[in-house]
From Swiss-Prot:
Residue span of region VTT domain: 173-316
Disruption phenotype: Mutants show larval lethality around 9 days post fertilization and defects in autophagy. They also have lipoprotein accumulation in the intestine and liver.
Main location: endoplasmic reticulum
Organism of origin: Danio rerio (Zebrafish)
Full protein name: Vacuole membrane protein 1
Extent of Basic and acidic residues compositional bias: 10-21
GO-annotated cellular components: endomembrane system; endoplasmic reticulum; endoplasmic reticulum membrane; endoplasmic reticulum-Golgi intermediate compartment membrane; membrane; plasma membrane; vacuolar membrane
Keyword Protein transport in annotation: no
Residue runs in coiled coils: none
UniProt-listed GO biological process terms: autophagosome assembly; autophagy; Golgi organization; lipoprotein transport
Transmembrane spans: 78-98, 110-130, 251-271, 274-294, 307-327, 364-384
């Protein structure tokens, strides 16, 4: 019987290599086809194929709105409760009374927090633009508060116009000794809200990988496919980038909460991989989000905030401007606009709006405003491109499913 069993197994062993060869060739052809489809999707941008891109963008927008409408209808009880609460808040907001002072205070704080949370989400999600709202919004805001604190000798800026505009307090009795901790306390709320927004923006990779692992379906996401390939070839990783990604994956998988906390606390471009890793290995949601929130909104934000405040302290800025003047040949011409900009900022701090002594616009501030405008426009364009590419992916997936059913 053993001999007969061996004879029965022999033909299977002979067919094994052919099956493997056929399977590997099928996998390679499928991989090549997916790569070609991905390249075709990436070519779908406004500056190359404007009409098709806009058409796909509007179609994807319609599909997304339809999906969200259906989801809201499925949760109509929660939606109804939300509408009732919103109506009650609107009623309290519109009725005159002694409570209006508290309502206006809560409204101001809520809108201020929502603004920074939204910027944090945009910075974390980015939609492929590399839009980092810390460099464009939060960093300059902290720098402005730091420069104003040293110039005014106080952080008790009049509200209004703060935070829309920073003006020194007229009452000299409000002046105090400025310390690092004083400035950090002044900008703590907006910094923590921005950090919380970046933590919320890390959730999509986590949920995508978790859903793919639990359902066993292929999400056709480039980052997730790269993650799976990295796991398959983890033993043969040679280059520095692959080893760094594997180190992050091992830390998150083995250390758990504190590994995620360490990755979230240190500025690094590989944290998206931590979200995918946590989702793939089914790490509990609150373990992932709790560690991410503490790391990004508290630890990392205090590191970044401290760096900006120290960099823009009065004596550091003055030394930097003086060093610019030392550059041979062009030092004096480069130093002049920086000195004019700092002088204009000091004048603006001591001249509230409407005093008539408005300082002339510095070309540095003009350039910065135009850079921000260009970044925002590029972000909007990239949203259109991204949604058009999502619709193209829908068409390709539909084509795959039709071919499988034939």
């Amino acid at each position: 019987m053993a001999a007969n069993g061996a004879e029965c197994e022999q033909p299977q062993k002979r067919l094994g290599p052919k099956d493997k060869q056929n399977g590997s060739s099928t996998d390679s052809s499928l991989r090549e086809r997916k790569q070609l489809d991905r390249e075709e999707r990436l070519s779908l941008v406004l500056w190359k194929r404007p009409f098709i891109t806009l058409q796909y963008f509007f179609l994807e927008t319609a599909i997304t709105l339809k999906e969200w409408t259906w989801k809201l209808w499925q949760r109509r009880g929660v939606v109804f409760l939300t509408v009732v609460l919103f109506s009650l808040f609107s009623l309290a907001y519109s009725i005159e009374g002694a409570h209006q002072e508290y309502v206006q205070h809560l409204e101001k704080k809520f809108l201020w927090c929502a603004y920074w949370v939204g910027l944090g989400i945009l910075s974390s999600v980015g939609l492929g633009t590399g839009l980092h709202t810390f460099l464009l919004y939060l960093g300059p805001h902290i720098a402005s508060v730091t420069l104003a604190a040293y110039e005014c000798g106080s952080v008790n800026f009049p509200e209004p116009p703060y935070p829309a505009q920073i003006v020194c307090p007229e009452d000299e009795a409000l002046q105090e000794s400025i310390s690092l901790w004083t400035i950090m306390s002044k900008v703590r709320l907006e910094a923590c809200m921005w950090g919380a927004g970046t933590a919320i923006g890390e959730l999509p990779p986590y949920f995508m990988a978790r859903a793919a692992r639990m359902s066993g379906a292929d999400p056709d996401d480039e980052d997730y496919e790269e993650f799976e390939e990295m796991l398959e070839h983890s033993q043969s990783a040679q280059d520095f980038a692959s080893r760094a990604k594997l180190a992050v994956q091992n830390m998150v998988q083995k250390v758990g909460f504190f590994g995620i906390l360490a990755c979230a606390s240190i500025p690094n471009p590989l944290f998206d991989l931590a979200g995918i890793t946590c989702g793939h290995f089914l790490i509990p949601f609150w373990t992932f989000f709790g560690a991410t929130l503490i790391g990004k909104a508290i630890i990392k934000m205090h590191i970044q905030k401290l760096f900006v405040i120290i960099t823009f302290s009065k004596h550091i800025v003055e030394q930097m401007v003086s060093l610019i003047g030392v550059i041979p040949g062009v030092g004096a011409s480069l130093q002049k606009p920086f000195r004019e900009y700092l002088e204009a900022q000091r004048t603006k701090l001591h001249n509230p709006a409407g005093d008539g002594a408005a300082a002339g616009e510095s070309w540095l501030s003009w350039v910065f405003e135009k850079v921000v405008l260009v970044m925002v426009c590029y972000f909007i364009l990239s949203i259109i491109n991204s949604m058009a590419q999502s619709y193209a992916k829908r068409l390709q997936q539909k084509k795959y499913s039709e071919e499988k059913t034939k």
